[in-house]
Amino acid sequence: MLPYKETKISDNTFIRVFNQDTDSVEFIWHRDMEDRIIESIEPTDWKIQMDNELPKSIEGKVFIPMSVYHRLIKGTGDLKINLIKLI
């Protein structure tokens, strides 16, 4: 089971909602098969951590390169993001 709910907006654009009640261990290191851009729809204290980097706030647009390991670090409240897959 995925740790988010997803709504498809177009072929490459999605809204994802990560629930605050999801256990932190569900947010595992992973990599994606395409470049992506994420942007939080609402202010948040959730963070994203890329391989070999310190966690950073999800502010503005965040580029996630294809095949780079990354993970979310849970904050307070739900996280609602706009996700664009650069395919």
Regions found by a protein language model. Give the residues of each.
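Transition segment at domain starts
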Residues: 1-18
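Conserved short histidine dyad/triad with adjacent acidic residue
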Residues: 13-32, 63-67
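Short acidic-glycine-tyrosine-enriched beta hairpin
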Residues: 50-69
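Ligand-binding loop in jelly-roll beta-barrel domains
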Residues: 65-87
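Short, conserved beta-strand element in jelly-roll/cupin
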Residues: 31-46
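Beta-strand residues in well-ordered beta-sheet regions across diverse protein folds
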Residues: 41, 48-49, 73, 82
